[in-house]
């Protein structure tokens, strides 16, 4: 399913809040994909939601 992940791209949760849509089986996997893509810690993940398009 398509999942929307909102995240802060810089250390200490700074910078503009960003949003990306990824294809994953669950919310945890979607957050992990974004953390790996942008090399950010879990605390930088702001929200994970179902993408409603």
Language-model-detected regions and their locations in the chain:
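Short amphipathic, charge-patterned alpha-helical segments
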Residues: 30-34
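Short, mixed-charge low-complexity intrinsically disordered segments
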Residues: 36-53
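Short linear/disordered segments characteristic of secreted peptide precursors
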Residues: 10, 27-29, 52
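Short aromatic-glycine-(Arg/Gly/Cys) micro-motifs in beta-strand/loop hairpins
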Residues: 1-17
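A short, exposed loop/beta-hairpin motif centered on an aromatic-Gly-Thr core
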Residues: 15-25
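A structural detector for beta-sheet-dominated domains
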Residues: 6, 23-25, 51
């Amino acid at each position: 399913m398509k999942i929307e992940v909102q995240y802060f791209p810089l250390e200490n949760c700074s910078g503009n809040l960003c949003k990306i849509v990824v294809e994953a089986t669950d919310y945890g996997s979607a957050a992990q994909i974004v953390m790996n893509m942008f090399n950010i810690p879990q605390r930088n993940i702001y929200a994970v939601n179902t993408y409603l398009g």
